[in-house]
């Protein structure tokens, strides 16, 4: 499958937000609170997603945005400033397992060099955990945040440069 990766433009914001909504639903359908998903307001979700102003790369297939990755300096690790974070990686379901997510992640890793990179994954999202492990991320921490009235198990995964860049 042919695709290109480029930086998000202002004109892309709505399409990116729509991908965020659609892929969020398909990803979390089996692990989120059904009441929350049933009451998820698409317009409100898209509006909120469109407002994010972090570095974002989009994947394009046939002039359509099919996925994105959002990353930047982390705010969750205060002991040093040599960490970046992947905040979101979403692909429409039909475009998963075509190396697009891998290419987005590799490009984000290049753009955050020389920082180490961290991210958080819901523990039940085993597909994502396996994907990140294949790239070289390792589970380093667990926490139990509460979203929408439900407590989740989250795994912090780190990509440490010294292990990968020799």
At which residue positions do the language-model features occur?
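Acetyl-CoA-dependent GNAT
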Residues: 3, 7-13, 17-94, 102-111, ...
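Active-site acidic-Proline motif in GNAT/NAT acetyltransferases
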Residues: 92-98, 123-124
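Short coil/turn segments at alpha/beta junctions that flank glycine-rich nucleotide-binding fingerprints
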Residues: 98, 114-115
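A general secondary-structure boundary signal
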Residues: 60, 96-98, 130, 155
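C-terminal "cap" of GNAT-fold acetyltransferases
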Residues: 82-84, 115-118, 122-129, 134-135, ...
